[in-house]
């Protein structure tokens, strides 16, 4: 082999070695960046109390009028995003900033199907009546969104280990819907209703009044209901019995 040829081969070998060294440095730099990013994610997760929840949406209504309208005017992607948004909003209303303050829920399923009623939540599943979607006159997407906020509240709220009155449970769910600005026009106006625990929109309006007396009242009430329920919670938080508060509420609005 000639001297010139040997020099060329040696230069090629050296250039190859240099390229390998450069690639190793690049890989080390990328690995370092990944470690930094992972560390940042872990830090942020610890700071903000990230809780991983899986959301699943299924349309079992097929080619029925409600199933078709759901597909055309609402859709699975929007429904899934609404479940996520509703969860974040509910945690905010309940002032639950860490996973320790919340229910442990790994998966929430939304099922669109033909059934009776409007919707219900059970065992971390939300069932919505496709017939209701199909026959609703008006902005069905807004109505559907409000229903999801109500039902998602049932997934996340505390119920006093089954001791909380049903009217209060439903009232808190509608209170969340009210604060999310998805209250429909047919709801009662403030001050209307016969009993504080009448439920739904009546109790939601009353809770809104109570929350105006003490900002964060509903969040504190929900926290107290983690392990049980007592009507004394109203006295502890607002200094009056719930019946006194109801009387004051009715008087404020001339009812």
Identify the residue ranges that each predicted region occupies.
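Sec-exported extracytoplasmic/periplasmic mature domains
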Residues: 91-99, 153-162, 174-182, 208-215, ...
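Active-site scaffold of zinc-dependent metalloenzymes
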Residues: 109-159
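N-terminal low-structure segments adjacent to metalloprotease catalytic domains
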Residues: 2-72, 255
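Second-shell loop/turn segments in exported
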Residues: 69-80, 131-143, 158-164, 192-195
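Auxiliary, metal-adjacent structural segments of Zn-dependent hydrolase domains
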Residues: 53, 61-131
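Post-HExxH zinc-binding segment in Zn-dependent metallohydrolases
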Residues: 86, 97, 162-205
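Stable alpha-helical elements in mature extracytoplasmic
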Residues: 79-86, 90, 140, 144, ...
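Pan-zinc metallopeptidase signature
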Residues: 31-37, 43-58, 197-204, 209-255
């Amino acid at each position: 082999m000639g001297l010139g040829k040997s020099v060329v081969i040696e230069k090629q070998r050296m250039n190859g070695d240099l390229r390998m060294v450069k690639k190793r440095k690049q890989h080390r730099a990328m690995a370092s960046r990944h470690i930094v990013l992972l560390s940042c994610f872990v830090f942020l997760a610890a700071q903000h109390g990230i809780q991983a929840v899986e959301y699943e949406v299924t349309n079992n209504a097929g080619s029925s009028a409600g199933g078709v309208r759901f597909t055309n005017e609402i859709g699975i992607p929007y429904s899934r995003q609404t479940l996520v948004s509703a969860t974040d909003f509910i945690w905010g209303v309940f002032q639950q900033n860490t996973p320790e303050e919340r229910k442990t829920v790994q998966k929430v399923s939304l099922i669109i199907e033909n059934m009776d009623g409007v919707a219900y939540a059970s065992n971390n599943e939300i069932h919505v009546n496709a017939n209701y979607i199909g026959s609703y006159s008006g902005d069905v997407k807004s109505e559907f969104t409000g229903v999801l906020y109500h039902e998602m509240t049932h997934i996340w709220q505390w119920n006093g280990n089954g001791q909380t009155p049903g009217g209060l449970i439903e009232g808190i769910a509608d209170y969340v819907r009210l604060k999310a600005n998805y209250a429909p026009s047919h709801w009662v106006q403030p001050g209307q209703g016969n009993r504080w625990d009448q439920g739904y929109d009546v109790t939601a309006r009353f809770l809104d009044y109570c929350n105006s007396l003490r900002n964060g009242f509903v969040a504190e009430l929900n926290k107290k209901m983690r392990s049980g329920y007592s009507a004394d919670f109203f006295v502890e938080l607002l200094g009056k019995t719930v019946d006194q508060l109801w009387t004051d509420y009715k008087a404020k609005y001339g009812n």
